[in-house]
Design a protein with these regions (language model features):
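Conserved alpha-helical substructure of the radical SAM core
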Residues: 3-119
Length: 121
């Protein structure tokens, strides 16, 4: 299960949220709506935002696509892609394509500066 892999790869700070998801799934509940920080990177340096200073690794393309599949299998109806600036995520096109292919709706929170370059999303 990808959630177990993520715990191992990403460390102890994810134990509580992943544990809560696992407990909900075991008791017949499912994550209907998911908010996913796909990256902390950003193309801007706003004085009020600390995202660019957060140094975390992003999921590999394979991990991200497996996570989408797992969210769909668990019954997620909608995924909110956020960040940093999600449009700088190198895998965003593939993530969105997979969300579409498994029938999960999605939304993207963006600062808007890269929308003309990534309009097909």
């Amino acid at each position: 299960m990808l959630l177990d892999d993520l715990l191992t790869d990403l460390g102890p700070r994810f134990r509580v949220p992943v544990g809560a998801i696992r407990a909900g799934v075991r008791h017949g509940r499912m994550p209907l709506f998911v908010s996913w920080i796909v990256t902390n990177r950003c193309n801007l340096r706003c004085v009020y935002c600390g995202c660019p200073d957060i140094k975390t690794s992003e999921l590999s393309t394979d991990q991200a696509l497996r996570l989408v599949d797992e969210m769909a299998e668990l019954g997620a109806l909608s995924v909110h892609l956020t960040g940093g600036e999600p449009l700088v995520c190198k895998d965003l096109d593939q993530i969105v394509a997979r969300l579409r292919s498994v029938g999960v709706r999605y939304g993207i929170s963006t600062n808007g500066t890269l929308v003309p370059k990534r309009l097909r999303l």
